[in-house]
Amino acid sequence: GAKRKNSRLSGNLEPFQCLNIDFRGRSDLKTLYLAEPCEVFNDFKGSENLYSAFYINELINFLITQSEESAELFDIYKNCISNLKDKKSIENILRNFELDLLGVLGYEINFSTEYGTNNDIDFEQKYKYSPQSGFSKSASGFDGKILNEISKRSFSREALIASKEINRKTIEYYFEELNIKSRVFFKWF
């Protein structure tokens, strides 16, 4: 196999390495015939970035069916991994990826309008969030100003925290019983 010590492919099979691949087979189990790097391999600048990349991989493995192909999703993934390797703001990268992933899968969150009324989110109001219906006015919850920031992807610290909560709630609602192992690593940081 490709993982054998003497395999001509083994040197190219690195985690998070962009590859041009060719595989063949009739069943779900395919044989890898070609694995060539698309670009120069860059390692992650820190362990927190690497653990974030593991989280991204886990999300994709749990949320995408094995036979599903998506050039748009691949571009989002590749951009996310590239940004993580450059040691940019990890929280920004992860929140953007989660929002993009939900959008590609058809579960895009509407941060601009109130549920049931189609009124714009009011900056002066608070809103509660439900994955099945969206945002509705409430005595407590998320500030409309913060929801606007998330909508524009200009994340303040508060917007990052709110986006993380909203994204997690949405992912767990639509994809029950996710057991994301990489979250355990973040408890150490």
Where are these regions (language model features)?
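Non-catalytic alpha-helical scaffolds and adjoining flexible linkers that form interface surfaces
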Residues: 1-189
